[in-house]
Amino acid sequence: MSLGSRTFRSKRQMAAFEKSLQGRYLKLLRRNPFLFYGVPFCTLMAVGSYCLSDFTAVKYEREDKKVRSVQEDELVKLRANRRTVDLKEEFYRLQGLADQDWEPVRVPRLPGESENVWDVE
């Protein structure tokens, strides 16, 4: 028969152990396993989140720099390539009046190709 990781203590040694700091701590752990598992886990998550926030901040700062540099380049191009705006021209363009100069023309079919006409009676 094996005792495993537990050590054998006499009654006097056990009473002294229970009065010591280590004994009181182990007694609390047996009653409240949250102190042993929950508190360290929550602490680890909070500290880890705080430490990793620097890495995520660097990531977003890089993205901001890329966007800012692209915007500056595009701004220079836009200022250089501006076109003059005529109010009437824009009105007709938006109305689509210039696109109505067409006629529907049927595409000639190849020899032997069906006309795809549906006889609905």
Swiss-Prot record:
Residues 1-31 form a transit peptide. GO terms for cellular component: mitochondrial inner membrane. Keywords: Membrane, Mitochondrion, Mitochondrion inner membrane, Transit peptide, Transmembrane, Transmembrane helix. It holds the Pfam family COX16. It comes from the Eukaryota. One of its GO terms (biological process) is mitochondrial cytochrome c oxidase assembly. Signal peptide: none annotated. InterPro entries: Cyt_c_Oxase_assmbl_COX16. It is a single-pass membrane protein. It is found in: Mitochondrion inner membrane. The chain crosses the membrane at residues 34-56. Required for the assembly of the mitochondrial respiratory chain complex IV (CIV), also known as cytochrome c oxidase. May participate in merging the COX1 and COX2 assembly lines. Belongs to the COX16 family. This is Cytochrome c oxidase assembly protein COX16, mitochondrial. It comes from Eremothecium gossypii (strain ATCC 10895 / CBS 109.51 / FGSC 9923 / NRRL Y-1056) (Yeast). The gene is COX16.
